[in-house]
C-alpha cells in the first residue's frame, strides 16, 4: 500500500504576488473549473496601546500543523465538490503589508469554491497550531490572538 504524502503548506517568508499569480495561471488548463475563490491574509499595521505593529513572526509545531491541515483538507473535499485546494502559510518574520496566508479553492461552480474557501480559512485560524508574535516598531512584542 502506498504511503500517504502530506502536503507542506509552509513557506519561509512572505507569500509573493508573483507566486500567487503563477498559481492562478496554472489553472487555465483545468477547463472543468468554473469558479475560484481566493483568500489573502495580509499583516496589518495595527496600533495597540499607542504602538504600531511593524511585522508578525510566525512559528508552528510543524508536524502537528501539517497533520491537522491534511485532516481539514480531506474534510473540505468530502463536504464540498471542490476540484482543487491550495493553502500556503508563511513562517518567519513578515512585514506589515505583506501576504502571510494564501488559500485558493476551485470548483465547477463559484458558490462551492467560495464556501469551501471561507470554511477553510476559518478552520485554519481556529485549529492550526501556528502562532504569531506581533513585533512593534520599538522592537517590543506581544503574542497575537487569532480572531
Task: Identify what each model region corresponds to.
Residues 1-99, 112-118, 122-147:
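N-terminal, polar/charged subdomain of small-to-medium soluble alpha/beta proteins
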Residues 104-106:
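Short hydrophobic/aromatic beta-strand micro-patches
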Residues 108-110:
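Helix N-cap motif at beta-to-alpha junctions
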Amino acid at each position: 500500500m502506498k504511503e500517504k504524502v502530506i502536503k507542506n503548506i509552509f513557506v519561509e517568508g512572505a507569500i509573493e504576488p508573483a507566486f500567487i499569480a503563477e498559481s492562478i495561471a496554472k489553472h487555465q488548463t483545468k477547463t472543468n473549473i468554473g469558479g475560484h475563490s481566493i483568500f489573502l491574509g495580509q499583516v496589518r499595521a495595527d496600533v495597540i496601546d499607542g504602538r504600531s505593529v511593524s511585522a508578525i513572526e510566525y512559528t508552528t509545531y510543524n508536524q502537528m500543523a501539517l497533520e491537522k491541515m491534511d485532516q481539514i483538507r480531506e474534510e473540505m473535499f468530502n463536504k464540498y465538490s471542490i476540484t482543487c485546494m491550495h493553502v500556503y502559510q508563511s513562517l518567519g518574520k513578515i512585514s506589515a503589508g505583506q501576504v502571510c496566508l494564501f488559500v485558493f479553492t476551485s470548483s465547477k461552480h463559484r458558490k462551492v469554491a467560495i464556501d469551501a474557501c471561507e470554511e477553510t480559512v476559518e478552520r485554519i485560524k481556529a485549529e492550526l497550531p501556528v502562532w504569531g508574535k506581533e513585533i512593534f516598531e520599538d522592537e517590543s512584542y506581544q503574542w497575537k490572538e487569532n480572531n
